[in-house]
């Protein structure tokens, strides 16, 4: 129900340390004795504190752990938990090396942190293989009338909307961003630290970015619209701002008022080719808009439609899901 993360980012060495401090609540009718924890890269999860626990199962290949609580979490009870995750270069691997922490243009989201609950995504899905192992038939999609299943979305399972606060520290020549509103900026040991908080509950889905950007600012009504971009990639920034303004005009007229006090579009390098909408904050790859050639009027203006699509997620996901 609450997140307060401390992120220490070191772009120059492609490394970071995250101390995740969360408040969790048992919303079920029975005590919780065992806690299932999934981690995308198991070796990055270096510390776990669930208020007293023992590790009863650990599958490092799947990044899956089961902890038994020394004191079960009672119905309605809240508890503070802590995780520490460390990411750093680890030589050359058989797969693709992590590329989201870079010298200029870091972007990663909350999926680098642990998640709670049984992970159906790790189940064997092949029907023949399941029969060989006597695992029964694969789970079917829930019925539309199953209200309990509505707590599970493509973003998170059985997760409440939460209060979000965070501090991110980065190199002295960079700006670090996260969803929410800037509370303060400080300098600690020569590094720039930015503290953010969201003023209303939000999904358990957030991002962190750090780079040396130029910023172009405009407004929609009294709402600041900001685009953070590489100084060499300013070609389509005005078109993005126009797309934000026109999208907000249409969505407010046909849906509901925009729920936040700012809109930020933030460029990240072409190591990924997508944009992703978080609460009031939209990371946006250089490869799908910032360096697009829009001079031919007969070609589809995908800068406009990608921007409009991401703004729409501020309603469809970040209000209704």
PLM segments and residue spans:
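Short, solvent-exposed beta-strand/turn "edge" segments of beta-rich domains on protein surfaces
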Residues: 7-15, 155-157
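Ligand-binding face of N-terminal immunoglobulin V-set domains in extracellular IgSF glycoproteins
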Residues: 21-41
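Glycine/proline-rich low-complexity spacer/linker segments in large multi-domain proteins
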Residues: 86-160
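A surface-exposed beta-strand-loop module
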Residues: 31-32, 42-104, 152-156, 189
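Catalytic Zn2+-binding segment of zinc metalloproteases
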Residues: 311-321
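Hydrophobic helix-coil surface modules that form long, contiguous segments used
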Residues: 138-308
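Short, hydrophobic/aromatic-enriched beta-strand segments in well-ordered soluble domains
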Residues: 20-24, 77-91, 164-172, 194-201
